[in-house]
Swiss-Prot record:
Residues 129-261 are annotated as: Mispair-binding domain. Keywords: ATP-binding, DNA damage, DNA repair, DNA-binding, Nucleotide-binding, Nucleus. Component of the post-replicative DNA mismatch repair system (MMR). Heterodimerizes with MSH2 to form MutS beta, which binds to DNA mismatches thereby initiating DNA repair. MSH3 provides substrate-binding and substrate specificity to the complex. When bound, the MutS beta heterodimer bends the DNA helix and shields approximately 20 base pairs. Acts mainly to repair insertion-deletion loops (IDLs) from 2 to 13 nucleotides in size, but can also repair base-base and single insertion-deletion mismatches that occur during replication. Gene3D superfamilies: 1.10.1420.10, DNA repair protein MutS, domain I, MutS, connector domain, P-loop containing nucleotide triphosphate hydrolases. One of its GO terms (biological process) is mismatch repair. Heterodimer consisting of MSH2-MSH3 (MutS beta). Forms a ternary complex with MutL alpha (MLH1-PMS1). It comes from the Eukaryota. InterPro entries: DNA_mismatch_repair_MutS-lik_N (IPR007695), DNA_mismatch_repair_MutS/MSH (IPR017261), DNA_mismatch_repair_MutS_C (IPR000432), DNA_mismatch_repair_MutS_clamp (IPR007861), DNA_mismatch_repair_MutS_core (IPR007696), DNA_mismatch_repair_MutS_N (IPR016151), DNA_mismatch_repair_MutS_sf (IPR036187), MutS (IPR045076). This is DNA mismatch repair protein MSH3. It is found in: Nucleus. Belongs to the DNA mismatch repair MutS family. MSH3 subfamily. ATP binds at residues 789-796.
Amino acid sequence: MKRSKQATLSRFFKKPKTGADAVHTEAVIGKKPTDSGSPAEQKDAKSPQQVTDEPPLEPVTVTTDVVAMDTQPDLSIGSEINSKSRPKSLASFKSGKSINTDHNPELKQKFRAKLELVRNKNDEDLPVITKKTKLNATEFQWYEIKKQHRDTLLFVQVGYKYHIYGDDAEIAHAQTRLFLSPGITNLKDIGNDGVVQQGSKYIKLAYSSFPVHRIDFYTKQLVEKGFKVGHVQQMEVAALKNVENKKGPMIRELTNTFTKGTYIESGNGGSVNDVQYSSYLVALHESKGDKPTVTLLATEVSTGDVIWDSFNDDYVKSELEIRLLTLAPCEILNCGVSSSTLKMCQKYMHRNKGRLAEMNVLEEEVEDPDAQVALFFEGKANAGTCSTVLELPAMVKTLILATSRYLTHCKLDSLFLLTNNFTRYTGSYMRLSANTVASLELFANTTDHTAKGSLFWVLNRCLTVFGSRELKKWVSRPLTDRTAILQRLSAVEAIIKSIYGAESDELTTLINKLVKLLKPIPDLSKMLMRLHYGQLNRKEVYLLLRELLFVAQEFKPGSGDKYIDTNPVLGEIFNSLGIHVSDIEKLLEEINPDAARQDEALTFFVTDPPSLVDRKKDLKKVEAELQIELLALRAELNRPKLQYSSVAGIDYLIEVANKDTKKLPLEWTKISGTKSVSRFRTPTLNSLVKRHEYCVEKLKAACDIEFNMFRSRCATHYEFFRSMVVAMSQFDCLFALAKVSGQSGWVKADYVDEGGIDLKDSRHVITEKLMTNYISNDIKIRCPTVVTGPNMGGKSSLVRQIALSVLLAHIGCYVPASKAQIPITDSILCRMGAQDNIMSGQSTFMVELCECAEILRNATSKSLVLLDEIGRGTTTTDGIAIAHSVLKHFIELEALTLFITHYPLGQLLDSEDSNKCDLVHMDITNTNPPIFTYKMKPGSATDSYGLNVAGLAGIPQAIINRAEEMGKDMKHDVMYQEGVRMLTDIKKVM
C-alpha cells in the first residue's frame, strides 16, 4: 500500500489546524482547495510556472525514536523553513542538534550511509503489491525510447531537471557520483504496456537527477568516458499547456545524441594545451583481396575539417597506422574492415580510451553513391558544391554518406556542405612513418603518452586554442618545397624582430597590434562551426561578431599589399583580416549589446521585428490588468503601499502577516510562507498570472524564431569569417615558432640540395627543456653512417636529435645549434625501439622487419633514414645477414642513413662499401668505471661496455665476473675470424 505524502509528513509534524487555516494548509500539502485550478494542474505541479507529469519522491520515513518538533514548519512551495526547526542531518533527528556536514567529509559519508540504510529498510518494509503497478507517464516515455536506443544513456527533461532512469542511472551514478535512488534497472522487468513484471524486486525505476543548467557538465563527463548520451527534451511549455488545457503527459522526444567524436562543448574558452586531445571521427572501409585498398574519412565536427584518403596497405597496416597516429581519432566507425584491421583499431582505441562503433554501409550508397550524394545536397543552400564531392573516389563518397547518417542524430550532417574544408591526407608534405611519429615523440612522450616531453609541447607557444590546433597540423606536415619554407621563415624572422628587436617600423606595428588582439580571444574556430550548426546562443553570436570586428577594424582592406613581394605570408594574412568590416558592422547594429551579454531574449534586438511588436503589446495589456488588480487589492486590504512580491522565481504574490490570515477570503490560495508572513494569490490574480505566463512564453517563442533567422543570416557569411579565423590561426603558429626560434642558441638553417647535414653545437630540442647542462655535438652527415658505441652512451638520442633538427627546419622553425646546413628532405623514415604487437599476433622481430620493409619501399635518395639495431631479434648470423643487406641497399641508394649497430663492422660492411660509408661512435673514457662523454667521434667503438650496464642494473657481481671471462674467449674467436677474413681479402687482391 502506497503511503500518502500527508501521512508520511504527519509522523514528523503536528496535525494541521482547523478552521480558516485548514483551507490554506490543504493547498500546501496537495489537497484540492476551492477554485485552485484543474485536477491535472494540482496533481503534479511543482510550482505555478511548472507542470510536469513526474510524481514527487516519497520522503524518507524515520521510526518512532524521532523527537517531536516544537514548531510546525511551513511546507508550502517556496517556503523558508527556519534553520532552528530544520534538521541538518539524520543524527539531528535524535539529538535535536543542528549538525553541519558540509566541511566534514567523514561525517557526510556516515550520513549518506545511514540515509541509504533507512531507505533500503523502508523498501523491505513495504507490503507485497498484489495489484499491477505501472510506470508513470514520464517513465513510460523513457521506456519506449530506451527500447529503440539501448546503447544510449538517456537524459530526460522533467521540468527544471533532467532525470536518468534504470540502468542508465546506475551507470551515471558509478561514473559521476550522482545520487542514485534504487529501483528497477533491467528492462526485462517491465512489460510492453509499462506494467512492472511479477517477481521484480522494485516497483519503480532506479533514477538520478540534476538541474537543467548542468546538462553540458554531465554530458561531457560521460561522453569523454566513451558513452553515447542522448537528450530527451520536453517539446511543450508548461504555461502554454495550462492555458490551452491540453491533457496528457508532456510530449518528449530524443532530440540529440552525442559521442566522443560528435560532442562539441559549449563555451568559448579552453586552454591551448587541450588540443593534444584530438576529436577526429574516422570512418574506415577496407576492400577484399590480396592487395586491399583502405579508404579513410576523418571529420572533426568542432572545426569542420574533413580529411580523406585511399591507399593500399601492407600486412601490418603501416600506412593506416601512420594516419591514426597523426590524426589521433577519438572515435572510429567500422564501415567494413578485415579482422586484422579491426584488431588494430581495437588496440588503438583501448590505449587512447576512444570509442569504436559499427556503421553499416547501405547497398544504395555503394552501388550508386553519385545519386545519393546529389540527393543529400538537393535543396541545400550551397548545393553548388556538390560537384566537389562528386569528383571524389567512389568509396570516399560512400563513407561521406554513411558518416552523414551517423551525424544526423547529432544534427551535424551539414558539416559535409562545407566542401572548402575538404583536403586529402597525402599532399606536398614530408612523409613521416608511424614509427617516426612515435619514436621522435612529436605529439606524446613514450613514457606515459602525454604531451609533456613531446616536440609539440616545446613548440606550442600559441596565444589561442585554434592556433594551437593549426600548429599541430604544421608539425605533422613539414613542408618539402624550398620556396614555401623560406617564405614561412621570412614571416618568422619578422615576428622575431617585433618581439625581441629594439627598432620599430610599420610591419612591426601591425604584428604587435595583432598579437595584442589575439591574447584574450576565445576559440573562434569552434564558435564558427557551432554557428554553422545553429548551436550558438545569443551571447555567443554577439561575442563572435564582436571579436571578429575588433580584428577587422584594425586592418584596413589592402593593408598587406605592400608586403606581398617582400613577405608574402604576412601580407596575405593582413589582407584576409580587413575585408569584411562592413558585413560584421551591419549585423552588430541589429543587436542590443547589454541584452546580448546577458543572453536576454526579449530585448536582444535594437529594433523589434513586427512579430515581436504584436506579442509585446499582448504582454503589456496583461501587465496593465495586473496593475489594476493590485489597485483593487490595496483598497480591499486597506494597504495603499502594497506591492507584488517575488520569491524563489514565483512572481505576483500578495504578502500578508500571519496574524491577519484569518481575515482573508477562503478562496485565496496560499503559495508560500515563513514564520511571520504568508503569500497568497486571489482567483483573479491566478487567472491573470496564467495569462501573463502564456504571453511571456508566446513572446519567447517568437523571439527564438526571430533569433534563429538572424543566426542563419550570420551563418551565410561562414566562408568569409572562416578566412579571417584561418589567417589568425596561421599568424598564431608563426608567432609560436618565432617565440621558440628567438631564443639564444637557435639559428636559421641554410637549405641545400647536396652536401648533407652539418650542425654545429647541435642540441636535442626536447631533452634540453627537461634537463640542464645538455651536452652539444658537432655533426656532419654526408653519406650513410654507421653509429656504434657503448650501451647508454647516447646513440639513439643523438640520431633522434638529428632527425628533429631536420624536421624543425622543414616546418619553418630555427634549429637548436650555432650553425645549421640541412638538405631539402622528402621523408623521415624511422625504425627504432623494440615492441611487439600481441593484438595482431606479431613478434618484436616481425614488427621490426615489417617496418623495415616499409622503409625500403618508400625511401628515396632525398630521405633521412634512422635504423636502430636491425636484426637483433633473431640469431646472430641471421641478424648480421639482414643488417648487412639492408645497409648495403641504402649505401647504393645514397640516402642519408644513420645505422645504429653493435655488430662487428667487418661482418657488416663489404670492403668495396667501406669508402661509401662513414663510421662514428659515442665516446667513453678508459677509466674504471668508464664515464660517458655523450660526444660523437669519428671511427668505430672498441667495446659496447655491456657488462658495465649490467652492473648498473643490479646484476650480481659473480654473474658479471663469469660473463667477463666468457666475453674474453668469444672476443678472441671473433678477432681470429676477422684476421682470417682480412688475409683472404689480401690474397684475392694479390
